[in-house]
Regions:
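N-terminal, active-site-proximal structural segment of metallo-dependent hydrolase catalytic domains
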Residues: 1-41, 50-56
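Active-site metal-binding loops of divalent metal-dependent hydrolases
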Residues: 8, 32, 94, 133-134, ...
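Active-site environment of divalent metal-dependent phosphoester hydrolases
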Residues: 10-15, 33-37, 97-100, 137-139, ...
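Metal-dependent phosphoesterases centered on the DNase I-like endonuclease/exonuclease/phosphatase
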Residues: 26, 108-193
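Structured beta-strand-rich core segments of catalytic domains in phosphoester-bond hydrolases
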Residues: 30-99
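Conserved beta strand-loop-helix elements of the APE1-like EEP
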Residues: 51-67, 84, 182-204
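Active-site-proximal loop/helix segment associated with metal-binding centers of metalloenzymes
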Residues: 89-109, 146, 154
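Surface polyanion/phosphate-binding segment centered on an Asp-His-Pro turn
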Residues: 216-227
Length: 227
């Protein structure tokens, strides 16, 4: 099974052909628009967002799913899906608390809060995936705040989740050789902030898209995991 996460930087409908060439089974897309069901004739599309042109979507090519009844639209943007094979998927597009505040009172956008909220649900299955644009790295950690990525990763590890990239490449968080974000599309402004965390599933390989192949489409490159 191939899992791909990618922040497409808007207009998925114009970029879908490119990402679809990678033949995903599960495609997690951030910053994408709401699309009609018939746009994906051979797949199922699940989406949530505040505006129709900017949200988080999941395209399933060989599975169906149901949005879990615990779904909380005040958590921006996190989509909990129960796949028909028993796997749980939390599609993720995380924001800082300050950025999430723009969505309105009571809205929370940080992944640390989403993990707290969905913890019982995630622990209800032996197999689970948390994947997407986390907008975070240990390089920005200060003090001992819950929102620090080091603390977030510690919570995930306590729940049995492992980052595919770090497991397969034997690299420490914050020292990643491969970037997933090229800020302002500059080749030298690199960050690793997109992740695939797995529990009860064994990754066979991981690939990070190249700057040259993807920079015309987005400031992010795809993260591609085979399990």
């Amino acid at each position: 099974m191939k899992i791909i996460t990618w922040n497409c930087c808007l207009n998925l409908s114009k970029k879908f052909e490119e990402i679809n060439r990678l033949n995903p089974d599960i495609l997690i897309i951030q910053e994408c628009e709401e699309l009609p069901e018939d746009f994906f004739p051979n797949a199922r599309y699940y989406w949530t967002g505040h505006t129709k042109n900017k949200g988080i979507g999941v395209v399933l090519f060989n599975n169906t799913a149901k949005v879990d009844e615990s779904f909380n639209d005040k958590l921006d943007y996190f989509l909990p899906l129960n796949l028909d094979n028993g796997t749980k998927l939390l599609a993720t597009w995380s924001f800082t608390h300050r950025a999430a505040g723009r969505f309105g009172e009571g809205h929370i956008g940080h992944v640390s809060e989403a993990i707290k909220y969905y913890k019982n649900w995630l622990e209800g299955s032996d197999k689970a995936i948390i994947s997407g644009d986390f907008n975070n790295s240990v390089i920005w950690d200060k003090g001992n705040k819950d929102s620090n990525f080091g603390n977030t990763n510690a919570v995930l590890e306590s729940m049995g989740f492992k980052s595919c990239y770090h497991k397969l490449n034997n690299e420490d968080f914050g020292t990643e050789e491969c970037a997933t974000l090229y800020h302002t599309k500059k080749r030298d402004k690199t960050y690793h902030i997109d992740y695939v965390f797995l529990k009860g599933l064994n990754p066979k390989s991981i690939e990070i898209g190249s700057y040259d192949d993807w920079i015309k489409l987005s400031d992010h490159v795809p993260v591609i995991v085979e399990i």
